[in-house]
Regions:
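A generic transmembrane alpha-helix motif of multi-pass inner-membrane proteins
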Residues: 48, 348, 352-353, 365-366, ...
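Membrane-interface "cap" regions at the ends of multi-pass membrane proteins
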Residues: 1-41, 45, 53-58, 69-70, ...
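Helix-loop-helix junctions that connect adjacent transmembrane segments
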Residues: 42-43, 117-122, 150-276
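Membrane-helix boundary/coupling elements in multi-pass transport proteins
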Residues: 92-106, 200, 205-213, 271-307, ...
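Membrane-interface loop-to-helix entry segments
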Residues: 122-171, 180-186, 224-229, 349-359, ...
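Extracellular loop-to-transmembrane helix junctions
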Residues: 26-118, 122-123, 227-231, 409-419
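C-terminal membrane-solvent junction of multi-pass transporters and transport-like membrane proteins
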Residues: 12, 183, 309-320, 357-406
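TM-loop-TM module centered on a large, flexible mid-protein loop between adjacent transmembrane helices
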Residues: 75-76, 82, 114-118, 225-289, ...
Length: 449
């Protein structure tokens, strides 16, 4: 494309389904970890986490409407604290997206195992094939993917809620089975509130896609709040539905929860439907993270934080060169990820997300003071209060994640951070040797249409 700009093709409903689809992945696989943290009380932890994420969503809504550029957090942090701080926030956001995709692919493969038992190697092979197929799809016109995701997400919403209602109305469901609500006490509840932030990483996909939206920016808050509500609804009902039938100990020993519970109540057909729709939901998650990872690179390249070749768009309006890099990184993590990957990712995710969200909150407060005249189609009420709540919450997320990280998680996180340093050094050196092509740029209303 000659103008090198992204197409504006996304409706409000598209953004809601893509953001919620990014949050709602293979819950029937990951729910084991939720029960391990806080038992049936995980539903309370999820609701608490969502309520604490809400101020952050409103902050994101204002910043997205003010600076609606692909790159999201990077652009905001760059405007508040400079090009270097923006670069490192960009690298942190990339970690969230890249590490999530293999996990989603594994989720699909694990659900396939419900229909036919497969080995860990076969799981990796299936996950790798899924990533290859999705690479080609992400280079197609965005509105095609958006329509596919909308159909898959809204269908899964209906199936998941229906399944949970069936569980709760079955004669084997008992409220007594939900007790004790918090087998690990307040410590388990608090840890879950901090670590389950991973299940809400998805609302932050909206800023990456906002440049391609075709509706008034003042309505962006609906996408944030709507996707958050739908996520809590599905997760909360799932916990109550299965928790009233099986024990926490049983959940810890099984491979995939909801379909196995369907078998227990004599509804194998329901388990098959859950697996099929769960797999489709994983595809929406995979697609959302992939699209946003490529647009993160696209936005960073426009600020000369990465090579300008990442701004190249194909005839469908997709950043195809950025898609190649995302595909390579995703494939690498998929092929070399150990079986304990799901144990690493919650803590690494929490630490990375906490730092990124803290930087975003601080940027929000600073830009309110330093750029008061910028047009804000959506403006947060009680800005200082929302900022303080978000700061306290993000610090708790960071703390909960760091204390739960084992040596394997620290090694993975450390290697990722070290991997980024050469890219940052290269960009800084090119600013000196080739300032015409690499001169630092910070996208803002002052220099963008």
């Amino acid at each position: 494309m000659s103008d090198n700009t992204l197409k504006k093709e996304l409706k409000l409903t598209n953004l809601i389904s893509m953001a919620a689809g990014g949050m709602i992945a293979a819950w029937m696989v990951e729910i084991k970890f939720w029960f391990e943290l806080s038992g049936p009380g995980a539903v309370v932890s999820l609701i608490t986490c969502a309520l604490l994420v809400l101020p952050l969503c409103l902050i994101y809504s204002e910043l997205t409407s003010t600076l609606p550029y692909a790159g999201g957090e990077n652009i905001w942090v760059s405007n508040a604290f400079g090009w270097n701080a923006g670069w490192f926030s960009c690298w942190g956001v990339m970690l969230l997206y890249i590490m999530a995709m293999p996990t989603v692919a594994y989720g699909i493969a694990s659900m396939v195992g419900f229909l036919y038992p497969i080995t860990f190697f076969q799981t990796k092979l299936i996950a790798a094939i899924i990533l290859v197929i999705w690479f080609f799809l992400t280079n197609k016109e965005l509105k095609i993917l958006a329509k596919m995701q909308s159909i898959m997400f809204w269908s899964t919403l209906v199936v998941s809620i229906t399944a949970s209602i069936i569980f709760m109305t079955n004669h084997q469901w008992s409220y007594d089975n939900l007790t004790p609500w918090f087998p690990n006490g307040f410590a388990g509840y608090g840890a879950a509130v901090g670590l389950l932030i991973m299940k809400f990483v998805g609302f932050d996909l909206i800023p990456q896609l906002s440049e391609e939206s075709n509706f008034p920016k003042k309505k962006l808050w609906i996408a944030f709040v709507g996707s958050l509500f739908l996520t809590v609804l599905i997760y909360g009902l799932a916990v109550i539905g299965v928790g009233g039938i099986v024990s926490t100990e049983w959940i810890a020993e099984t491979d995939i929860v909801d379909p196995r519970v369907a078998d227990i109540i004599g509804m194998h057909w329901l388990g098959v439907i859950i697996v099929i729709m769960g797999s489709l939901t994983c595809l929406t998650t995979l697609s959302s993270f992939w699209l946003c990872a490529s647009r993160t690179l696209y936005g960073a390249a426009k600020q000369r934080q990465f090579t300008p070749i990442f701004t190249a768009l194909n005839k469908e309006g997709q950043p195809w060169k950025a898609n190649i890099v995302v595909g390579i990184l995703s494939m690498y993590f998929t092929v070399f990820a150990p079986e304990a990957w799901i144990n690493y990712i919650y803590t690494i995710y929490g630490a990375a997300a906490g730092v990124v969200y803290l930087l975003v909150t601080l940027s929000f407060l600073k830009l309110r003071k330093t750029k008061p005249n910028w047009e804000r189609p959506y403006k947060v009420k009680a800005a200082m209060l929302m900022g303080i709540i978000s700061i306290i919450f993000t610090l708790w997320v960071i703390y909960s994640s760091v204390v739960a990280m084992d040596m394997g998680a620290w090694i993975v996180l450390g290697l990722y951070l070290l991997l980024g340093i050469p890219f940052w050094v290269y960009a800084k050196s090119k600013q000196k040797t080739d300032p015409e092509k690499w001169g630092a740029i910070i996208l803002s209303p002052d220099n963008q249409k």
